[in-house]
């Protein structure tokens, strides 16, 4: 059986995305390229201001298999009112990416990513990649290497919850970057792997090829 490509709609939110600002919706650009590189379709990739009515209209009008809304997952007055949605997932025990949310309506998936670039990057490389892997190959998870925590030099005790950490892997060792703050965009630029810590003695290492 030949599978049809998944169809995505990307909605970036934020009133900072205007012609008068130098801020660009790079999360949406990255996700758009990631989806296409994995041989699926982006039907629409739009950027809208912080407007609840406009966002609801775009969500309700979506005919794509998967709609990803980026930004507006915080608790300020301009952020999304999630009482309008019947959420299946309302946050993750995870850093970065804790504000992630999801609901399903009429067999279509709607996901909310935080606007923070590091969070969006991790969720794209783990959740979107996992969905594509399940759809393409009927596999329940993406490939990873299992690493003993004692073989990696990093103070994992400082982590308060399950975490994806940016790192660099070469032939000899695995280096976890010291500054794992979600505002540190250098991690995205220099990392070639994500290391998942789930409070056990085994780490999962996911290679980043994008």
Regions found by a protein language model. Give the residues of each.
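C-terminal terminal segments
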Residues: 142-210
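Anionic-ligand-binding alpha/beta catalytic cores of soluble enzymes and soluble regulatory domains
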Residues: 78, 96, 101-147
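Solvent-exposed alpha-helices and their adjacent loops that cap or buttress functional pockets
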Residues: 2-5, 61-62, 93-94, 102-105, ...
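Phosphate-binding glycine-rich loops and their immediate beta-loop-alpha structural context
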Residues: 1-70
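Fold-independent oxyanion-binding glycine-rich loops
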Residues: 11-15, 27, 48, 70-73, ...
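Structural motif
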Residues: 7-10, 65-67, 108-112, 174-175, ...
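Glycine-rich phosphate-binding loop
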Residues: 58-103, 114
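Gly/Ser/Thr-rich active-site loops/lids in small-molecule metabolic enzymes
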Residues: 26-34, 84-100, 131-138, 187
